């Protein structure tokens, strides 16, 4: 993941105090260093500033951000967090339209697609993303978020000024913007948490761009456009057609997400979701003469204290080992002690900027910090139960 941040105002001229506002942009990406750490950059114009903290995945050498391109004397700039999986479909169309690609990064594809197709181009993207584009010709700043909200994007808008960031903590680097909670904030944390009401940023006057939406900020103010929405329709396919369709989508999804300029691994719990992802990823790696790295996690002494329940009748380990025998991956078993878990609790809250699922967040943060030493990209079975409406196995 990367971290993005920035601000925009058509009433203020940021370059009148250039060093001051450049320092603000630097402070914003420094707050997001845990989201990247490979590189950082800023971009400042009279009416907009962009800041980026990079985790390099695609075109490690030439994909630096903010990325700026020029047309008819105007700047077009982007800061982007995410992955686009259909660049192979977009590049030929853009190339034939006369766009000259200087990198192999998906960042450049997004920026050129905006310049060519306009603001609604986002409906053409297949991927997970949050990004901001400054259109120097139209004097407009756009904020985009992917269809299901995989990548976060928070913002504050007041008195003709917009501030945005991947995490709330970076917003509070902006002058006169400080964290405060309200009665509604407490309702969110105590009644809804660890989830949130869609669009709610918990802190006072902080909001989150809705999944499947994009915002446009200009002289007319802030507008919100829905480019995609989940529809509830009767399922009319036969059982056989459903199996074939889901199989195609899973294979296509994993294949597209294996494309990276850095090693890709999977998390393997032995459950249905992670096992399917791992099996498909391992097959892809074998086709390319490589072995997939996999990781599983457990708590120290869980073999002694584990108690069966209806949600988890057995430990993960036997199922993990079964999948390892089937997939022939290069596997690493990771453990977390109770002491380490306790030490990570505050770090987990700081990473989310608010209370979450305590031991779940803390252990995941710890395990991910270990995995990152070997792999920057991992595929997991997260959220499959949400898409299929239940965490329990079904026929």
Model-derived segments and their meaning:
Residues 376-385:
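Short acidic/histidine-rich active-site segments
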Residues 1-351, 364:
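Cysteine-centered catalytic environments shared across enzyme families
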Residues 388-395:
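Conserved small/polar residues in nucleotide/adenosyl-binding loops
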């Amino acid at each position: 993941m990367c971290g993005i941040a920035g601000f925009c105002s058509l009433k203020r001229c940021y370059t009148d105090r250039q060093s001051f506002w450049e320092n603000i942009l630097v402070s914003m990406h420094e707050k997001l260093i845990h989201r990247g750490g490979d590189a950082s950059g800023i971009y400042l114009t009279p009416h907009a500033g962009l800041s980026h903290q990079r985790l390099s995945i695609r075109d490690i050498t030439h994909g630096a951000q903010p990325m700026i391109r020029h047309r008819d004397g105007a700047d077009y700039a982007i800061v982007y967090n995410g992955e686009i999986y259909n660049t192979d479909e977009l590049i030929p169309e853009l190339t034939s339209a006369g766009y000259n690609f200087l990198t192999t990064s998906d960042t450049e594809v997004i920026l050129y697609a905006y310049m060519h197709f306009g603001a609604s181009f986002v409906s053409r993207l297949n991927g997970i993303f949050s990004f901001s584009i400054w259109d120097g010709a139209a004097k407009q700043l756009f904020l985009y978020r992917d269809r299901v909200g995989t990548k976060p994007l928070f913002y504050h808008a007041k008195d003709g000024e917009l501030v945005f960031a991947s995490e709330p903590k970076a917003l509070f680097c902006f002058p006169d913007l400080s964290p405060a909670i309200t009665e509604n904030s407490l309702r969110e944390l105590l009644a809804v948490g660890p989830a949130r009401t869609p669009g709610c940023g918990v802190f006072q006057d902080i909001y989150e761009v809705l999944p499947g939406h994009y915002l446009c900020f200009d002289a007319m103010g802030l507008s919100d456009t829905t480019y995609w929405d989940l529809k509830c329709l009767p399922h009319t396919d036969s059982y056989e057609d459903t199996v074939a369709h889901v199989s195609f989508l899973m294979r296509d999804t994993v294949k597209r997400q294996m494309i990276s300029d850095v090693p890709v691994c999977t998390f393997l719990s032995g459950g249905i979701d992670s096992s399917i992802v791992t099996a498909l990823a391992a097959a892809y790696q074998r086709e390319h003469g490589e072995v997939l790295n996999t990781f599983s996690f457990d708590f120290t002494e869980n073999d002694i204290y584990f108690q069966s329940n209806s949600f988890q009748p057995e430990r993960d380990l036997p199922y993990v080992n079964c999948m390892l025998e089937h997939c022939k991956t290069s596997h690493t078993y990771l453990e977390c002690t109770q002491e380490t878990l306790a030490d990570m609790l505050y770090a987990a809250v700081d990473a989310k900027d608010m209370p979450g699922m305590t031991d779940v967040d803390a252990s995941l943060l710890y395990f991910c910090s270990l995995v990152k030493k070997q792999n920057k990209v991992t595929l997991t079975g997260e959220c499959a139960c949400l898409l299929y409406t239940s965490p329990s196995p079904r026929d």
